[in-house]
Amino acid sequence: MRSKDNSLRIIDLWTFRSTKSHKRYIVEVEGFENEFYGIKFYWKGVEKSKDRYSLLTNDFEPRTIIRSCIEVMLEYYRKNPLVSFGFVAARDLEKDLKGKNIDVESGSRRFKFYQRMMVNLFGPETFYQASDTTNTIYLMINIKQLSTGAVSIKDIEDRLNQTYNGEYIINVER
């Protein structure tokens, strides 16, 4: 749940269409201080649902969808090489977990998938990767920002706790 903090704002809405399912997806990019951007996406067909970030389309094309989100991230990075990114991997809905042997304590299936993709696609030279597996938050913090002290893990953790009224603890992925 978000706090009443008005520093959170949606900077851009991006759209793309899947070449496989032909479904249109919306990517929301939220801007925070210190060049930090939160990335969210969902299928346009469920945009009014409170569960829009958790709903599965069962089209089995997550890699294509995530690659499209990464293209959005890269566009921000090309414009400003000091940007950092974060996202929350939405929890699986109860109906999607029925009958499946899934360890929800180590993060959602989405979280594990996103984590694997980010570690494989982005090296440690550019982004310091950290996470909170309990709350399925994944961060890619710009190394230049960290090394100059412009941002710290503690700053980001505090901001997450303030904005989303939570108790987030960021663990380093290195």
Which residue stretches match the model-derived regions?
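Non-catalytic substrate-recognition and accessory regions of acyl/acetyltransferase enzymes
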Residues: M1-R174
